[in-house]
């Protein structure tokens, strides 16, 4: 009984709806990953291919870890999966911004800033994996700090991302922030389901933004 109280308890209908969201989300994002990898490989450029594979790995990793944690029965293993699930989010955030920073900027400032972003993400992983109970007092703030630090990027070309790339990037962030509102209200019916719906929408929108950037890079000389 003590183990059960460590984790949120949802109704059968909520769990069924959440399972449906995870299945549809994995299928949709899986198709998106295949499209992105195909598009990146057509460029025959190491940077485009590398950042795309990194991004796709981060997105799939967070989807799979979320499914593993949310649908594992309450037991000792679930506690470990919870740490992994909350840690991988930092990796996914850094992996999401990497294509925009390195392909959008390509200057030395972008490279240093990308390194700073990953250092923050890895610090978040250490925080969650090594100091999980203590880290919970900060709730979602570490994630928001890593997510919004992108807008401090000092390389001007990053702010001139082509076409629909930047609007899609911002829209994805809006979806995530709406999701955080649901996440912060665990007693609201279907809050966990709505949180995951917003995550899928945010990830899908960012995936479209990465795709738009890859298509632009394939048609034009390197930026920056």
Predicted regions and their residues:
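Multi-pass alpha-helical transmembrane bundles in non-GPCR membrane proteins
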Residues: 1-224
């Amino acid at each position: 009984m003590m183990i059960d109280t460590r984790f949120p308890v949802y109704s059968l209908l909520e769990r069924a709806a959440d399972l449906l969201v995870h299945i549809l989300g994995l299928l949709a994002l899986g198709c998106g990953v295949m499209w992105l990898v195909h598009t990146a490989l057509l460029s025959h450029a190491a940077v485009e291919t590398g950042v795309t594979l990194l991004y796709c790995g981060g997105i799939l990793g967070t989807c799979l870890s979320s499914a593993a944690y949310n649908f594992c029965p309450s037991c000792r293993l679930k506690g470990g999966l919870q740490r992994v699930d909350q840690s991988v989010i930092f990796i996914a955030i850094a992996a999401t911004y990497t294509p925009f920073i390195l392909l959008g900027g390509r200057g030395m400032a972008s490279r240093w800033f990308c390194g700073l972003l990953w250092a923050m993400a890895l610090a978040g992983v250490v925080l969650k994996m090594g100091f999980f109970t203590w880290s919970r007092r900060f709730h979602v703030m570490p994630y928001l700090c890593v997510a919004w630090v992108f807008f401090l990027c000092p390389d001007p070309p990053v702010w001139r991302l082509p076409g629909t790339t930047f609007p899609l990037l911002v829209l994805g962030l809006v979806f995530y922030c709406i999701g955080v509102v649901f996440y912060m209200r665990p007693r609201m019916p279907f809050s966990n389901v709505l949180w995951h719906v917003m995550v899928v929408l945010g990830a899908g929108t960012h995936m479209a933004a990465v795709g738009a950037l890859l298509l632009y890079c394939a048609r034009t000389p390197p930026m920056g």
